[in-house]
Amino acid sequence: MTTENNKPPVKTANQRGAARLAAVQALYQMDIGGTGVLEVVAEYETHRLGQEIDGETYLKADASWFRSIVAGVVRDQTKIDPLIRQALQDDWSLARVDSTVRAILRAGTFELLERKDVPIAVIVTEYVEIAHAFFQEDEPKLVNAVLDRIAKQVRVPAVK
């Protein structure tokens, strides 16, 4: 099925997926710009989530999920970053990782640690898809490998 201009219809992302993407963007903004958590959460909730900016409409997102991820990463960063460092290759430091990838890994690690109600596969897949939105090649593979290693360390796999 296509629209009048022969483009496939846009699939709406689920609200949690949109919240994850917004959280990654907010964490990136905080990392690069030094913006505080309260300021960035207020900005996203007021001006971005579900809003139109420069002709682009942001997806409607689960605001409480968004807040939980951003605030949780900030709160637990001293626990999250060492897990990521351990899951990276031996010669890689967290500072060497691209800022966007770092934000993705932090958000994904937070969910693996704190959102036991969400299956590992859902968390890893969602964050790999977010990586694909920003990168073409190696970065999504890195996100997959690192989050998979962390999941094996912090979660008991689901019994099939």
UniProtKB/Swiss-Prot annotation:
Gene3D superfamilies in the record: NusB-like
Transmembrane regions: none
Function: Involved in transcription antitermination. Required for transcription of ribosomal RNA (rRNA) genes. Binds specifically to the boxA antiterminator sequence of the ribosomal RNA (rrn) operons.
GO molecular function, one term: RNA binding
Name of the molecule in the record: Transcription antitermination protein NusB
Biological process annotations from GO: DNA-templated transcription termination; transcription antitermination
GO CC terms in record: cytosol
Record's keyword terms, sorted: RNA-binding, Transcription, Transcription antitermination, Transcription regulation
Family indicated by similarity: Belongs to the NusB family.
